[in-house]
Every structure is written in structure tokens, then in C-alpha cells.
Amino acid sequence: MPKREDINKILVLGSGPIIIGQAAEFDYSGTQACLSLKELGYQTVLINSNPATIMTDTDIADKVYIEPLTLQFVSQILRKELPDAILPTLGGQQGLNMAMELSEAGILDELGIELLGTKLDAIDQAEDRERFRALMNDLNEPVPDSGIATTVEEAVSFADQSGYPVIVRPAFTMGGTGGGIAQDEAELRKITANGLTLSPVTQVLIEQSIAGLKEIEFEVMRDSVDNAIVVCNMENFDPVGIHTGDSIVYAPVQTLTDREVQMLRDASLSIIRALKIEGGCNVQLALDPAQDRYYVIEVNPRVSRSSALASKATGYPIAKVAAKIAVGLTLDEILNPVTGTTLAEFEPALDYVVCKIPRWPFDKFVRADRRLGTQMKATGEVMAVGRNVEEATQKAIRSLDIDINYIGDEELADLNEADLVDGIIHARDDRIFYLYEAIKRGYSVDKLADLTKINVYYLDKLLHIYEIEQELIATPFNADVLELAKKNGFSDEVIGKMWKTNEKEVRAYREQMGLSPVYKMIDTCAGEFESQTPYYYSTYELENESIVSNRKSIVVLGSGPIRIGQGVEFDYATVHSIQAIRQMGYEAIVVNNNPETVSTDFSMSDKLYFEPLTVEDVMNVIDLEKPEGVIVQFGGQTAINLAEPLAERGIKIFGTTVENVNRAEDRDEFNKLIQANGIRQPQGRTATTTSGAIEAAESIGYPVLVRPSYVLGGRAMEIVHAKEELENYMKNAVKVSHNHPVLVDQYLVGKECEVDVISDGENVVIPGIMEHIERSGVHSGDSMTVYPAQTLSQKVQDEIVKVSIKLAQSLECIGLMNIQFVVHNDEAYVIEVNPRASRTVPIMSKVTDLPMARLATRAILGESLVNQGLKPGLHPAGEIIHVKAPVFSFTKLDNVDSLLGPEMKSTGEVMGSDRTMAKALYKAFEGAKMHMPDHGKVLITVKDEDKGEAIDFARRFWELGYQLVATKGTAQTLAAHGLKVETVGKMTEENNIVDRIHDHRIQMVINTISDSTTSAADGIKIRSTALTYGVPLFTALDTVDAILQVLESQAFTTLHL
């Protein structure tokens, strides 16, 4: 069937902010879909609330709306744009749920708008647990024994009959949100209550546990004439019971027989056909090889996280093909863009092994519960490609950008036996390291398989790595053993440790032996057809498939996996840099390892190397390609950290020099620069010991802000009020040394603001000044931000511009730089300078209409800003007010305190834009899913120093018609100022705060911490309960002021005579 001519305008629903379970993969799929539809000649309209994505760039769709993905705003845009159709299946769970909501509200019928791709009934059938179970029974597809519950008591009743353990799976959620495995009634009650709250239809499936079986995924495609194919099959390293987003995954499947693969393939195709899904679909199955049977776990009737992985693993562009299927094209009409010759109906073939390992946020949240289950906890993932499981796994581990770059974690050597076994049985994010340690200690693979239900095949691979390790230790500088090690993924650095030498010596010996990697192409067809893809991975074989052109090339280093502090914003900057390089006539070569992102779409660059971001792996690419140089400033701290070692090896680093980057990041050097220019900054000192830190704090005066040097996202940063707190911080939060000092700064209370700077080494352009709503002490990534600045005096703004220009020129900045200020007593103090792209680049590029990363790249490559049409100084601001709001994933992580502070905790962001501050704030809160009730009870429980401000806020809530509830101390303060307030009991008393939140007798919580340990523990419990039950929670008083501005702008004044 040719493409449909009866539709012209198509609206694409985006996926909203990045949260755990819904990350950058939807930026990738949404971008692909929009470009695909434009290519076919359709007019496209996009709605997405996330300003950090490539998808919301104005050139991706014909019209882009960065607006809240709520019924109110989407309906308004639909009535204005009147599209012929909506495509919801590329916007994750958010897109599907929005489509269902629009249909139920009658908007689609009212406006005569058609839903493209998978039909609503199919979505409902796949997502509604009861209907899905009924369909599987009709198809004779086996599902675990299960029951539907809409109350906690119904869940308990099913479990009483079936026995424990049971798995709880909420309907219409993603990332396993609200789910879990319950071992007993108490756990079941807790998980079900949470699951019912988080399910938009208040429904959960209670399922007999099949934990321990093999978990297999099939990524399938179907078109409107019932052609259906399998794009990719994948096997989870971890058995059923751990969310696939938290599991190590291999493609293609490694341990299944041909018969088993065929059995599961037939089931997957039968299901997609029965659901009549048009586009991409992910089928998850559990296989019990011992009984020769399987179960269907669930189906995602949309493009998913696994689709992005399958696309990158195979080279098959699932989202692009799905968009074309949605407008009527069939698989036998769509050309495969990888080969340029085969059609999309050909199933990809893989002649390599792909390994995906999740990236978890536990380096940020050290107190979080690291145990893995059916609710996803990872923020991102890495992918590595090799010729065998060992090579792919080892490359994936060193792609994670964690402190461990080898499967043999030296710190586990001192672990006692009981803790080792516990770490093996109770799966955590680091279980693979525990398994390897157990193998080193002589545990048999059969014993480990019995303890974990992980297939012996994979444990054998770990044993093989250990055997090679032993050979390396026994025979240093042996060419045959070295070749064996390299073919199995060992890095030069790790081999150096085993040979008691260093990475450079190993590299020199390897090159002397003529041992260098070759690059193989990912081409969807295992080399069967001629391919056009410039998409490569390294391995140690003979034939190199990456042909070096005679064009001048530039290597751009990506930012690796999505994590807190280094999110999709850096991928945005990377993609813009690639575009500028290509526009200037250079060949753009990307090195990155994140399967979720736009930068690793092979069509974005001239060449893509899917490799770990380490010195060795990057140098191997450079040795082959011989580029003009490398750009590091768009890849976050991951890429910046590679600048110095690459420069030491004679590689040209484009942009700000390594020496000037170090001047900005080294505290003593930076202090000298600040003083030489007469710039204000909070007093600060460095310390390399605990006693040195205490001495520094006492000379500056408490409170102080302490942090390690060279960090991103405020890792291990705290505000410390007393000596005991500082001693505890030094002991538990940082590893301090002469090479890694701790920074101790005066903590100034004031308003924070920040600027991004573009410089060509001479001219300096400041796109705008962003003002933070929360006062200093809250990490910039977690603060609400407004542009243009609303409350800064002209004097302060002028000072910020002057200081920013002076700093950029003094640091000889070429490219981008970010500067953060605190305004104290109407004076601007510099608190931080980051000589690289920051996480504010996407949002500022959009609100100022200055493509900052593109402009910066052109400056880096020698084109002056003036020649690019820019006027030096502060770029004039428009009339529209833009508010960025952070978005958090606290409901996914147990034991993580939601109190905001100097350590970054948000996973994503949204933007609200309008002509007034109150309207922009309202949109930002709505986009962040912080919907405010217009009446009810507000709980106020604050520390002593906040009580003065709390009185004013309480009065404003009271005047709006809200009732006030407070704990004893706060209640007395409010009552003394003439406010009617109800006193509520503390945690140990009856009718306490937590009970009331649990019973929905509190509609909003304002809670700031007290430093005393009992109150601190109470505060954590109050906050976590509010989050669990979906009650709006505020832990910073400035955010309360912002929400009051919104509520007051919507309220009418009622006057009595």
C-alpha cells in the first residue's frame, strides 16, 4: 500500500521529562519518527514538555510546542492546529496514556482526529491486565496464574489462595512503576497500595511468581497487511524477577536451542498479530527449559527502551520504520536505510554479540536500597559490541564510567564469605562483580547457577575471563596470551596491573607485536549484502572494514550513559556540534556508547564508533582515523576527563586548552585568577586531610559548603554546620588525597543565577542570565530557573555580564563555558566556573533562538562570532517568560531522601513558557506532574530558622481558603500570629502525620529538615510517605512561594461587606 494521501497534518506526542524507566530512548525514537514523516511530505506538529531534547528543536517538526503533556494543554493545541491524525506510540507510556485520555474525554471524536499506528483498543488490550490475560487465554498462550485487584484486600485474597511469593504489576505504567515481588502479606499490602496509587486506572495484576526462569525479549514489527518480522531477540543475564531495564542483556540470545527460539518467535508474532499492532512492539517471555515451556510476561504495544537497544544492536531503525507503517506503508515497500538495497521486511542478522549493562544512580544515592526487583532503578545504560560474550561484557563494564573499569573489583577481596554470598543471592546493581569474586575464590559455576538461577553458560564466560587473568599474571609480556586477552575484552590498563607495569608500556608492547584492533561494520545483514552504514565496533581480528577517507575529520566524544548530573542535555550539545562540523565541510566522527541517544544514530554523523569512552579505546579510533583533532567540551565530565591524557599523547584538543580547563577546575589556580581580576567569590580553601578541612572551616566560619574537586552534578557535596558533621563527611562521603583535595567554601545565603558563555577567544556572547528560584544551597540542576531574570537589579546584571566576559577572556575560553553566581546583599559572587557545555545549553538555545553548541563549534574551528552574525555582550531577551522545573524519580528508589540540597537528585526537566511569571510557573508545575489541589489541608512542618518565613506562607494559604495543619512547634508559632491551625501528632503519637498522608487527609506537604537526629528521621519518613501517596511535597521555601504565586493568580478575591 502506498502512503496515505487522505491525511496531511500529523501531531506527534512526545514522552515528557526523563525519569527512571523513561529516558533518552524516546528522544531518539521521537526524533526519528518526526524526520521520517517530514521526509514523506507530511506536515508535523510536536508536543513535548522536555526542553533538553533534540526532538524539541524547531527543525525536527514543522511546529514544536514545548507545553505540558496534560489533557488541558494538549486539547488546546489540538483545537488550534486541527491535525488529521495523532501518532502516540513513539512517546513512551506518556504518549499512550495521553492518547487514551484524549479518547475518553471525547476530544478525538469531537475534532475528528484519527489515531495512527496501533489502535486504541489494541493499546487498551495490551495495557489493561485483565483484557490482556483474557486475550492470551483465547490464543492458548500460557500466562502465569494471576488475578486482577483494584483494592488491597482483593490482592491479599488472591495470594491467600495461590500462595506466596507473588508479583505485583500495576496497569498502564512503565519501568515496573509501583510493582514488586511480595514474599508475605505485609509486603503485598505495602506494594499493592503503592501500585494502585501509581496506576492511572487503579488496577494491578497479582501474579504467581515465576522468578528464576530465563527472561527473553522479542522486538517485533507488523504492518497493516499483516506482514510481521522479528527485528531482534535478546536474552537477560538475570532471570525473571529483575526488571529488564535493570538487567544485563545480550543480543542475540545465547543459550536457547533453535527449537526454543522458534517456539518463542512464533508466540511473539502470534501476539502482535492478535493485537493488530501496526508498528513496533516488545514481547517479554519467561522460558523454563527444564519443563520445555514458556509464559508470556507482558507486551509493550509501542516503541520502548528495548526498541532503542534493538535498533542500535542491529542497525535496524525501528522508530523510523514504525512511523512509515503508521501512515500506510508496508514492510515490503520501505527501504532499509542501512543497506540501501534490502527492504524493511528482511529480518536483521547479527554476526557479533551485543551486551547492554544498566547505569544506576547509586553513586549519587549512597543510602538507597540497591537491591533489584521488578521496579526499574537504572537511569541509563551502555552498549558494547564484540565477537564474543567476554569481549562485549568487558567493553560494557568499562563504558559505565564508574570507579571500577574491570570485572575484578579489588575492593571485594576483603569481603567476608557471608557478605559475598548475600551479594550473590540478593541481586544488586553490582552482582556481576560479586559473582566474579566468588569464581576467584573457587566457587563452581554450578553452585553459583544454583544460588542465582543465572544460566551456567554466562557463568562459564566469567570463569573464562578469570582463567585468562591467571595466564596474564603468570606470563607477563607473552604475545600469545596478550592476543587472547585482547580478543576477550581486556584493556591495556587492566593488563598493565596484572603485569605490574602501566598502560603505556602495554600499548607499546602490543604495537610492537603488531596487535591493533580492527573495526567491523554493523550492517543488519551479517555482511550478506553491500552496506552503506558508517557504524563500527572494534575487535581483535584481521580484516578492517572501516575505510578512512581523504577528507579532514574531527572526532567528537559523547557523554556516555544517562546518569544524574549528566543527562540527555549533553547528547543534545554533541548532536549540534556534529551538525556544525558537517556544515563546515569536515567529516564528523563520533565515539559514544549509549544506545538510547540521538548521537548514536548512525545517520547523524559521517562515522559512528560504538566504543567505551576510555583513553585506550578513543586512541585506537584516533590512530586509525588520524583526525585534525578532538572536541571534548560537549560530552560532560566524561569527555573532559579524557582531554589531558589525550593531549599528553600529542592529540590536538580543539577549543579551550587543557591548561586553561585545569586553571578553572584547580582551586588554587582559579583563586589566583579571580584575585588577579578583582572578582568577588566566597572565601574558600582546599584541604587534603580531615584536620585540614576542620581548620579551613573554622577559619572561614560555619556553615561551609564542602565538596571534592573535579565533579559533575554536585557529587558528594554538602552544607556542613558543625565540626562533627564535617568529620562525618570526610570519613564517609569522600576519598581525600593530595591529588584529590576537598574544597571548603563559605556558604553565602542568597539568590543563585547562572550564565552560559560563547567565546571565540576574543569576542564573548552571553545568551542570557538565568535566575534560580530556590536560594543558594540547592543544586542548580534541582532548582527551578527563570529566564529572563525577574528580580535581579540592573546593577547586578551589569556586574554579571562584566565578570563573565572578564573570566572568559582570562581563561582564553574558546567554545562554551558556564558560570554560576550567588547574589548576596546585591553583590554578585562567582561560585563556580565550568569550562564546557553545561546542562542549560538546550533550554537556553531554545529560549534565545541561539543554537549555542553549533555556534560554539564553529568558533572552536576558527570562525569568529562576529562573522557568524553575533553581537558581543548580553543577547537581548524577548518578552516571553520561561521557567524550567526539575523532575525527580524518587518513587522508583527506596531510602532516597527527597530533601533538596547541594547534591543533584533530579533526572529530568520540563519547561513552562508564557507572558506572565505566574502562567509560566503554572505550566512548569503541570509539566512536572505537580498538580496543585485548589483546596484542602496543607501540612507545614519546618525547622526553627524557617518558621518566620512559614508564617507569611501559611497566611497566604489561609487567605486562599486552605486549612492549616502543623506539628506542635510550628503550630504554636502560627497560632501566636493569629492563624487558625490544627496540631497533628509526631511520628510516635497516634493520629500522626504519616497516617493522615496515608489516608489522603493531607493535600500538600511543606517540610524542611531539622538537624536533630530524631526530627531528621521524622522528616525523611514524612517526605517519603508524601511521595508514595502522590501528595505534592515541597522541601524548599522558595518553591512554596512560587506555587503560591500560581495559586494566587488563579484565585478570585472574596470580600465581605
From Swiss-Prot:
Residues that, per the record, bind Mn(2+) 4: 832, 834
Domain MGS-like: 930-1057
Residues at which Mn(2+) 1 binds: 284, 298
E.C. number: 6.3.4.16, 6.3.5.5
Stretches the record annotates as Carbamoyl phosphate synthetic domain: 547-929
GO molecular function: ATP binding; carbamoyl-phosphate synthase (ammonia) activity; carbamoyl-phosphate synthase (glutamine-hydrolyzing) activity; metal ion binding
Positions that bind Mg(2+) 3: 820, 832
Positions annotated to bind ATP 2: 707, 746, 748, 752, 777-780, 820, 832
Keyword Glycoprotein: no
Catalysed transformations (reactions): hydrogencarbonate + L-glutamine + 2 ATP + H2O = carbamoyl phosphate + L-glutamate + 2 ADP + phosphate + 2 H(+)
GO biological process terms held by the UniProt record: 'de novo' UMP biosynthetic process; glutamine metabolic process; L-arginine biosynthetic process
Protein name as annotated: Carbamoyl phosphate synthase large chain
Annotated ATP 1 binding sites: 129, 169, 175-176, 208, 210, 215, 241-243, 284, 298
Carboxyphosphate synthetic domain: annotated segments: 1-401
Organism: Pediococcus pentosaceus (strain ATCC 25745 / CCUG 21536 / LMG 10740 / 183-1w)
Binding site for Mn(2+) 3: 820, 832
Top EC class for this record: ligase
One GO term describing the cellular component: cytoplasm
One Pfam family, short name: CPSase_L_D3
Keyword Electron transport part of the UniProt annotation: no
InterPro entries reported for this sequence: ATP-grasp, ATP_grasp_subdomain_1, CarbamoylP_synth_lsu, CarbamoylP_synth_lsu_oligo, CarbamoylP_synth_lsu_oligo_sf, CbamoylP_synth_lsu-like_ATP-bd, CbamoylP_synth_lsu_CPSase_dom, MGS-like_dom
Summary of subunit composition and partner proteins: Composed of two chains; the small (or glutamine) chain promotes the hydrolysis of glutamine to ammonia, which is used by the large (or ammonia) chain to synthesize carbamoyl phosphate. Tetramer of heterodimers (alpha,beta)4.
